[in-house]
Swiss-Prot record:
Name of the protein this chain belongs to: Chorismate synthase
GO biological process, one term: amino acid biosynthetic process
SUPFAM superfamilies recorded: Chorismate synthase, AroC (SSF103263)
Chain's role: This reaction introduces a second double bond into the aromatic ring system.
Amino acid sequence: MSHNTFGHLFRVTTWGESHGEALGCVIDGCPPGITFTLSDIQSYLNKRKPGQSKYTTQRRELDQVEILSGVIVQDDGITFVTTGTPISLLIRNMDQRSKDYSAIVHQYRPGHADYTYDVKYGIRDFRGGGRASARETAARVAAGAVARKIIPGVIVRGAVIAIGPHTINRNRWNWSEVDNNPFFTPDAEMVQVFSDYIDKVHKNGSSVGAVVEIVAENIPAGLGAPIYAKLDQDIASLLMSINAVKGVEIGDGFAAARLTGEENADEMRMGSDGKPLFLSNHAGGIVGGISSGQPIIARFAVKPTSSILIPRRSIDVDGNDVNVITKGRHDPCVGIRAVPVGEAMVACALADHYLRHRGQVGCFKR
């Protein structure tokens, strides 16, 4: 299988499978002199790791990251400094139960990558889905933690704004609520609504989808390039690469098609600090493929988990009609744990464009 690497200057290669011995990533192109600690990476992995609530898979993984190369430990024994050589990060798998998948060795799960992987490669890893599993995203989160260190002052954070048919009230948006509930939602009043809905669907043996919003702040104007190197193009590409993501929008996205020109235009005035002041942000912080200095806003849709207990019609590898039931431990709403993954992918795209801009232009205009 090819295509396990993304990025241009800040390049990340992920490796490993859901039920393999370990998974991880190699980061190439990280500048020397970047400092971080293990806890800087671990805090994001802890946000993504399974088994933290009944609304995620009950697979128990510590997701403790190990750094194998690319850094020097400082005298305090805690701080790492990058050397400019490839950074290798490893996360060991501890709680695989491959026997749970014995019934689908020769069956294709509807909505899963079983069939398409098999038809392309002539072989597939049925144990937890292999590379098609959400487990693969742990390595991305680790890479995203390093990426955050490259742009000075950058803040990248995400939240669940919809689960199934239920959507938050944006007037109640409070970032401080996101880490106080198992759904990473900024609307405290929706916690019980989400809980009741997922409980009902999961009790019936099914799963639900979600919409996640990512906001990046303190991004300098000028990142990205016209036509084939647009910043929003790369953000969309990386978000779409996340397993189970079926749609991405930047700024107002598809809603912009329902606006008039005067409604959609982000008007400008000169601020008291001598910098441009935007009166709105319909563009989501990116115009013409280049960052405007406003917050960058992206949303992505995560489909319901394909592995469910309700029988679904499918076929087996011999072409026979079958009814598939997937046992094992699966997320009733995988969109919840997609929040730190989306953050990581946006952070990696921003770090890559930051280095590309610095290499071509050399400095930033604020």
